[in-house]
From Swiss-Prot:
The keyword Flavoprotein does not apply. It comes from Bouvardia ternifolia (Firecrackerbush). NCBIfam families: PRK04208.1 (NF003252). The lineage of its organism: Eukaryota, Viridiplantae, Streptophyta, Embryophyta, Tracheophyta. This is Ribulose bisphosphate carboxylase large chain. Its EC number is 4.1.1.39.
């Protein structure tokens, strides 16, 4: 026997492959307050036991690899390894299980969503032993939450900046989303803001294209904001999309927005990436800019029920990375969103402390301590007839974003904005008087339409418009 072989034997090293569950499945483990906890929906390949599948997820997303390695002896696996500590079947689904995994906090860089996701939702999602894998929820411990700055300003500071209280905020995405010149784009913004909206918005794919370069758009939109403010006496804003091909260009656009004196910029946080988003969030905090977040690409990640990552995880990640608004489903309208599940992650965005509630898809109690909240944004196929339901379901701390529901008004953009503002004010007034928006909503809108020809015209145009499809995102 060679000296080298003797050395291997003397330290207990045994080459080869062993089952993951022998090391990473630990049902006796008691979770710590400092652990990051994850709930994975696991669909094992035929013949793979759920314990082995859950342990494989824990291993491949923390310290494990496919074979025993020498260097395991140079560190403390008990201190650093992820542990699958509980597995339960998914009711009503064949061969699907929820695997709960605990990760020691020292596995993750402080203040880095990028690093957290690189481990937890990294290569493990391509693992051959699994047919499918979905991250349903994360519990972020207080010790890790406190390493993030979170939203640049938060809900209360935004209301103070805008001097708008006691109602949802109103917005509009300018359409057509692509093809307008900067001057015509600015004109549409002005008409909507003058009509009564609080915000107008760049569409997520408006960056700096040949038909409208970013600097021209910023200038004309700033002119629209100042003109509308002078005429209405209200503070107005336009979400100027600072998303760019590199971080330096993104920050340059945000700097120009600040120099123009506008209140808010925008970022596509999934296509732009978490590192870029956190950098922009820090700039916005330091320079008094609000930050609107669009979730373009989210459905690629979260739409499939058995693979990918649920949006509640992306919402938590955004709150940590930083953003003052984020699009988060409507329940009504044309885009995906089941009511209880949507309200679950809306609470995760807005509230300080959220209790575990499996009926709403919340797998863990989450304490955000002092981190500011994020305003959820409702958009996609909504119009004046949806106003009572939106006001009732989401309350005051939300942004209601009507694109086609403003610009599609038969009389033009400003009357479309007037119709939405009148409908909102009528719903808030009725709610404050104790009326039931769920049962009396249509009547409230009809009463308001008697005094607003703009609202009456909008009601007539969209009276038959419905988007009736079953939600894909169910428990």
């Amino acid at each position: 026997m060679s000296p080298q072989t003797e050395t291997k034997a003397s330290v207990g090293f045994k080459a080869g492959v062993k089952e993951y569950k022998l090391t990473y499945y630990t049902p006796e483990y008691e979770t710590k307050d400092t652990d990051i906890l994850a709930a994975f929906r696991v669909t094992p390949q035929p013949g793979v036991p759920p314990e082995e599948a859950g342990a494989a997820v824990a291993a491949e997303s923390s310290t494990g690899t496919w074979t025993t390695v020498w260097t395991d002896g140079l560190t403390s696996l008990d201190r650093y390894k992820g542990r699958c500590y509980h597995i339960e079947p998914v009711p009503g689904e064949e061969d699907q299980f929820i695997a709960y995994v605990a990760y020691p906090l020292d596995l993750f860089e402080e203040g880095s969503v990028t690093n957290m996701f690189t481990s937890i939702v990294g290569n493990v999602f391509g693992f051959k032993a699994l047919r499918a894998l979905r991250l349903e929820d994360l519990r972020i411990p207080i010790a890790y939450v406190k390493t993030f700055e979170g939203p640049p300003h938060g809900i209360q500071v935004e209301r103070d900046k805008l001097n708008k209280y006691g109602r949802p905020l109103l917005g509009c995405t300018i359409k057509p989303k692509l093809g307008l010149s900067a001057k015509n784009y600015g004109r549409a913004c002005y008409e909507c803001l003058r009509g009564g909206l609080d915000f107008t918005k760049d569409d997520e794919n408006v960056n700096s294209q040949p038909f409208m370069r970013w600097r021209d758009r910023f200038l004309f939109c700033a002119e629209a904001i100042y003109k509308a403010q002078a005429e209405t006496g209200e503070i107005k804003g336009h979400y100027l999309n600072a998303t760019a091909g590199n971080c330096e260009e993104m920050i340059k656009r945000a700097v120009f927005a600040r120099e123009l004196g506008v209140p808010i910029v925008m970022h596509d946080y999934l296509t732009g990436g978490f590192t870029a988003n956190t950098s922009l969030s820090h700039y916005c905090r330091d320079n008094g800019l609000l930050l609107h977040i669009h979730r373009a690409m989210h459905a690629v990640i979260d739409r499939q029920k058995n693979h990918g990552m649920h949006f509640r995880v992306l919402a938590k990640a955004l709150r940590m990375s930083g953003g003052d608004h984020i699009h988060s489903g409507t329940v009504v309208g044309k885009l995906e969103g089941e009511r209880d599940i949507t309200l679950g992650f809306v609470d995760l965005l807005r509230d300080d402390y959220i209790e575990k509630d499996r009926s709403r898809g919340i797998y863990f109690t989450q304490d955000w301590v002092s981190m500011p909240g994020v305003l959820p944004v409702r958009s996609g196929g909504i119009h004046v007839w949806h106003m009572p339901a939106l006001t009732d379901i989401f309350g005051d701390d939300s942004v209601l974003q009507f694109g086609g529901g403003t610009l599609g008004h038969p009389w033009g953009n400003a009357p479309g904005a007037v119709a939405n503002r009148v409908a909102l004010e009528a719903c808030v007034k009725a709610r404050n008087e104790g009326r039931n928006l769920a049962s009396e909503g249509n009547e409230i809108i009809r009463e308001a339409a008697k005094w607003s020809p703009e609202l009456a015209a909008a009601c007539e145009v969209w009276k038959e418009i419905k988007f009736i499809f079953a939600a894909v995102d169910t428990l």
